[in-house]
Amino acid sequence: ATAPITIIEFTDLQCPYCARFALETWPALRARYVDTGKVRFASRDLPLPFHAHALPAAVAARCAGEQGKFFEYREALFRGQARLAEAPYDAIAARFGLDAERFAACRANPAVAQSVREDAAIAKANGIASTPSFVIGREVEGQFVGEIVSGAQPLETFVERIEAALAQP
């Protein structure tokens, strides 16, 4: 079954407000809406130009995702955000039991970084320039229609917007 509402997140793994959302708001949001099938959550990357470690971190998280550990890996990056300059990617991968060779090959693949840049281009084309930003909406006649929520808003803001979207016919 597909969820009636989709939230598309645009995040930067070096952004402190993105970390706040991921560590404080996301667990409750996931439990209440994603795990219950009411909302589909898609994470997209928007590495900001002044965050030198955001692109390599995004690539590493995607590569962890190829082995089924995206959200766990992302949480570890957010928790260790102050140490991103040390490029802890392989150590975190080992902690989650990822295949090191596969992980390294993925990180070295230029197509992965290109897909991160494509997410950023989509954000820009839709007027999204800050992180975290979210688009909460649904598909209507083949088009995604939604509203943008900017910043690490409290859970209540998401609940209000999601419930309003769910109430629409």
PLM region spans:
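Short capping/connector residues at structural and topological boundaries
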Residues: 1-2, 154
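Structural alpha/beta surface segment adjacent to cysteine/selenocysteine redox centers
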Residues: 3, 8-94, 99, 104, ...
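C-terminal cap of thioredoxin/glutaredoxin-like
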Residues: 10, 90-169
